[in-house]
Amino acid sequence: MGTHGSLTKAGKVRKQTPRLPAKQKKNYPPRLKNRLKYQVRIEKVASARA
């Protein structure tokens, strides 16, 4: 039973791709994050229907 490609080529594409610097993420506390989700899902939909 053979393998799908040789193990010597494993990770070839990932090594060739250029490394990009990490982007800064806004890390909201869970309470604020849930409030923002609620506003997007519920309040904006309700105001659009009214």
Swiss-Prot record:
The Gene Ontology CC terms held by the record are: ribonucleoprotein complex; ribosome
The answer to keyword Magnesium applying to this record is: no
Q: Name one GO biological process term.
A: translation
Which stretches does UniProt call biased (Basic residues)?
A: 11-28
User: Region (Disordered) spans which residues?
Assistant: 1-28
Q: Which InterPro entries match?
A: Ribosomal_eS30 (IPR006846)
Domain of life of the source = Archaea
- Protein name, as recorded: Small ribosomal subunit protein eS30
